Swiss-Prot record:
Protein's recorded name: Pyrimidine-specific ribonucleoside hydrolase RihA
Molecular-function GO terms, alphabetical: purine nucleosidase activity; uridine nucleosidase activity
HAMAP family registered for this protein in UniProt: Pyrim_hydro_RihA
InterPro entries found in the cross-reference section: I/U_nuclsd_hydro_CS (IPR015910), Inosine/uridine_hydrolase_dom (IPR001910), IUNH (IPR023186), Pyrim_hydro_RihA (IPR022975), Ribo_hydro-like (IPR036452)
PANTHER family: INOSINE-URIDINE PREFERRING NUCLEOSIDE HYDROLASE, URIDINE NUCLEOSIDASE
Keywords in alphabetical order: Glycosidase, Hydrolase
Family: Belongs to the IUNH family. RihA subfamily.
Function: Hydrolyzes with equal efficiency cytidine or uridine to ribose and cytosine or uracil, respectively.
Upper lineage: Bacteria, Pseudomonadati, Pseudomonadota, Gammaproteobacteria, Enterobacterales
Enzyme Commission number(s): 3.2.-.-
Length: 311
C-alpha cells in the first residue's frame, strides 16, 4: 500500500525536482501539496506548485498557499539562487487550475483528518506552515506518522556561517517542529551537500528524452550555474530537497544517526543554527533521525530511473 504523504514546499529548483520524484513513485500517495514562502515570495512559490502539477498532469492534487511570512520575523527569500520566478531556466506551462479556497494549515488539517492512516509530512522549505499546524491542531498530532524535513546542518551553514537557509528563515517554527514529540527525520547540509548532481548526470537526465526529464535537465542547468562559485568547492549542484523523497523510497541509500536537535533562536552569530547533540552531551533524549551520508551514485540512479516514468 502506498505511503500517504503531505508535501509542504517553496519551489525552488530542488523543490520542483522533489515533486517530480514523488509523483513518479507509486510507493507514495501524495495527498496534498502546500506552499510556503522561502526560495521566493509566497505568491511565486504557490504559482510554481501549480505550474509543476500542470506540467506533470496532476491537477487532481489539492494545493493551498501558506503563511506569507515567518512566525516572528520578516521574510527572507533566496532569489539570488532560484531567480526572479523561483524556477528560472525552463519554459514551464502556465497553471491550468486554481488552488483550494483555504489556507495551507486548513488543507493540511483536512488531509490528516480524512486519512485512514497516519500521514508523513515532507517539508522542504521553512517550517512555518508545519509549526502553525502543530500549534493550532494538537488533536491531529497522532495522525502524523513523521515529519521529514530538508533543513539544518551539523556543521557549516549555507546562508550564514552557522545556519542553513530553511531553518534561518524561521528558526522559531523549526524549534516547534523539533520539540513537538513527533518523529522528525532531518536531511541537512551534511547529507545534501554530498547529493550533488554533476554536469554528466544532467546530460543523462536530458538523454531520457521525455518532456519532464528535459525540464529537470533545464532546471539543473540553471541551478548548476549558481553553484559554480568557487567558495562552495562543489563539483556539481547539491540537490537538497529530493533527499527527503529519496529517503522515503530508498532509506538504504542514506546513513542516519539518532540525536537530539535544538534550534538556536537568539544567538548573536548563530541564529537559525541546528544544534545537534552528536556526542550525547546534553542528556536529552534523541528527537530526530539525522542524515549524515548518502550513496551519491545510488541517488542519481534513482532519479534517472524515476524520470523514465514520464515517457
Amino acid at each position: 500500500m502506498a505511503l500517504p504523504i503531505l508535501l509542504d514546499c517553496d519551489p525552488g529548483h530542488d523543490d520542483a525536482i522533489a515533486i517530480v520524484l514523488a509523483l513518479a513513485s507509486p510507493e507514495l500517495d501524495v495527498k496534498a501539496i502546500t506552499s510556503s514562502a522561502g526560495n521566493q515570495t509566497p505568491e511565486k512559490t504557490l504559482r510554481n506548485v501549480l505550474r509543476m502539477l500542470t506540467l506533470l498532469n496532476r491537477t487532481d492534487i489539492p494545493v493551498a498557499g501558506g503563511a506569507v511570512k515567518p512566525l516572528m520575523r520578516e521574510l527572507i527569500i533566496a532569489d539570488n539562487v532560484h531567480g526572479e520566478s523561483g524556477l528560472d531556466g525552463p519554459a514551464l506551462p502556465e497553471p491550468t487550475f486554481a488552488p483550494q479556497n483555504c489556507t495551507a494549515v486548513e488543507l493540511m488539517a483536512k488531509t490528516l483528518r480524512e486519512s485512514a492512516e497516519p500521514v508523513t509530512i515532507v517539508s522542504t522549505g521553512p517550517q512555518t506552515n508545519v509549526a502553525l499546524l502543530l500549534n493550532s491542531h494538537p488533536e491531529l498530532h497522532s495522525k502524523i506518522a513523521r515529519i521529514v524535513i530538508m533543513g539544518g546542518a551539523m556543521g557549516l551553514g549555507n546562508w550564514t556561517p552557522a545556519a542553513e537557509f530553511n531553518i534561518y528563515v524561521d528558526p522559531e517554527a523549526a524549534e516547534i517542529v523539533f520539540q513537538s514529540g513527533i518523529p522528525v527525520v532531518m536531511a541537512g547540509l551534511d547529507v545534501t551537500h554530498k547529493a550533488q548532481i554533476h554536469v554528466e548526470d544532467t546530460e543523462r537526465f536530458r538523454a531520457i528524452g521525455n518532456p519532464v526529464s528535459t525540464i529537470v535537465a533545464e532546471l539543473l542547468d540553471f541551478f548548476l550555474e549558481y553553484h559554480k562559485d568557487e567558495k562552495w568547492g562543489f563539483v556539481g549542484a547539491p540537490l537538497h530537497d529530493p533527499c527527503t523523497i529519496a529517503w522515503l523510497l530508498k532509506p538504504e541509500l542514506f546513513t542516519t544517526v539518532e540525536r537530539w536537535v535544538g534550534v538556536e533562536t537568539q544567538g548573536k552569530y548563530t541564529q537559525g543554527m541546528t544544534v545537534v547533540d552528536y556526542y550525547y552531551l546534553t542528556g536529552n533524549k534523541p528527537n530526530a533521525s539525522v542524515m549524515v551520508d548518502v550513496d551519491r551514485q545510488g541517488f542519481v540512479d534513482l532519479l534517472a530511473d524515476r524520470l523514465k516514468f514520464y515517457a
